């Protein structure tokens, strides 16, 4: 197995010692490591201390390290699909790019599932199809949001007339992406170490709010004396509880 960071040998010894499959040990270790590293983005890499570019780069590098540790060269599938989708976003008409991106990404993911069905049937080992499913959600949501914003921008006069006549904002969109992200923003989003392995899906706008440190300042709680620390505690509590459920579920599967 590809071992660019010299950790596979350690996990192989640990697997022999515990009797647990190496891919399961690696996955649990990576998830726990990601949880322990995440708070540094609120301390050492706080938006007031680190630039958005630095936060993107660190998150991207960690994502690549974690994914390559778990999946080895299979990580190239994720990079290939992301790159193809980025080229589509840059070259295809924005009014049609959402459907083309959906077809391409789902087709590639389906081929990966079919490959596993025919050549690795009844295999319970973890593979790159998990992160690929998360990637398909990210790529298609990005393409559809880009299309929606450009379509509404193109028909802004019609939308304004409709609002004036009916008193509603039926064409209002929640996420505003009017141009294709830069390469750093795109790959930083796709390979974010917190969502790369098993999700959850985070929309591009939400990711950029986190990168720029706007996720707490923009979404303030109601004026009830709550502070940012309260928000952070709630987020961390929910995050750890969800990850703990995932780890416990995986452990139960290993014991069955």
Which sequence ranges carry the predicted segments?
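Membrane-embedded transmembrane alpha-helical bundles that form the catalytic cores
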Residues: 1-256
């Amino acid at each position: 197995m590809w071992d660019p960071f010299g950790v596979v040998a350690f996990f192989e010894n640990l697997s022999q010692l515990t009797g647990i499959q190496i891919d399961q040990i690696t996955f649990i270790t990576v998830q726990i490591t990601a949880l322990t590293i995440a708070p540094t983005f609120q301390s050492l890499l706080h938006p007031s201390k680190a630039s958005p570019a630095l936060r993107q780069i660190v998150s991207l590098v960690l994502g690549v390290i974690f994914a390559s540790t778990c999946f080895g060269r299979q990580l190239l599938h994720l990079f290939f699909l992301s790159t193809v989708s980025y080229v589509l976003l840059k070259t295809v008409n924005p009014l049609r790019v959402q459907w083309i991106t959906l077809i391409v990404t789902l087709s590639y993911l389906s081929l990966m599932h079919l490959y596993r069905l025919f050549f690795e049937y009844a295999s319970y080992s973890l593979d790159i199809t998990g992160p690929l499913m998360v990637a398909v959600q990210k790529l298609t949501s990005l393409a559809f949001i880009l299309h929606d914003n450009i379509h509404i921008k193109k028909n802004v006069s019609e939308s304004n007339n409709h609002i004036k006549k009916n008193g509603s904002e039926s064409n209002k969109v929640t996420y505003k992406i009017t141009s294709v992200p830069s390469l750093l923003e795109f790959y930083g989003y796709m390979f974010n170490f917190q969502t790369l392995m098993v999700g959850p899906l985070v929309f591009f706008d939400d990711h950029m709010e986190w990168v720029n440190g706007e996720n707490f300042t923009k979404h303030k709680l109601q004026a009830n004396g709550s502070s940012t620390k309260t928000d952070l505690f709630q987020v961390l509590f929910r995050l750890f509880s969800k990850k703990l459920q995932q780890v416990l579920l995986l452990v139960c599967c290993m014991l069955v």
